[in-house]
């Protein structure tokens, strides 16, 4: 159920980390 949300969160974090 929270798989999609978890993936979305991971992608958001990864994007933020890359932007840094």
Curated annotation (Swiss-Prot):
Binds 2 Zn(2+) ions per subunit. Keywords: Lignin biosynthesis, Metal-binding, NADP, Oxidoreductase, Zinc. Pathway: Aromatic compound metabolism; phenylpropanoid biosynthesis. It catalyses: (E)-cinnamyl alcohol + NADP(+) = (E)-cinnamaldehyde + NADPH + H(+); (E)-coniferol + NADP(+) = (E)-coniferaldehyde + NADPH + H(+); (E)-sinapyl alcohol + NADP(+) = (E)-sinapaldehyde + NADPH + H(+); (E)-4-coumaroyl alcohol + NADP(+) = (E)-4-coumaraldehyde + NADPH + H(+). One of its GO terms (biological process) is lignin biosynthetic process. The keyword Metal-binding applies. Its EC number is 1.1.1.195. It is an enzyme of class 1 (oxidoreductase). The keyword Coiled coil does not apply. One of its GO terms (molecular function) is coniferyl-alcohol dehydrogenase activity. Its cofactor is Zn(2+). Involved in lignin biosynthesis. Catalyzes the final step specific for the production of lignin monomers, like coniferyl alcohol, sinapyl alcohol and 4-coumaryl alcohol. Belongs to the zinc-containing alcohol dehydrogenase family. This is Probable cinnamyl alcohol dehydrogenase 1. It comes from Pseudotsuga menziesii (Douglas-fir).
């Amino acid at each position: 159920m929270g798989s999609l949300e978890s993936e979305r969160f991971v992608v958001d974090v990864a994007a933020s980390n890359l932007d840094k």
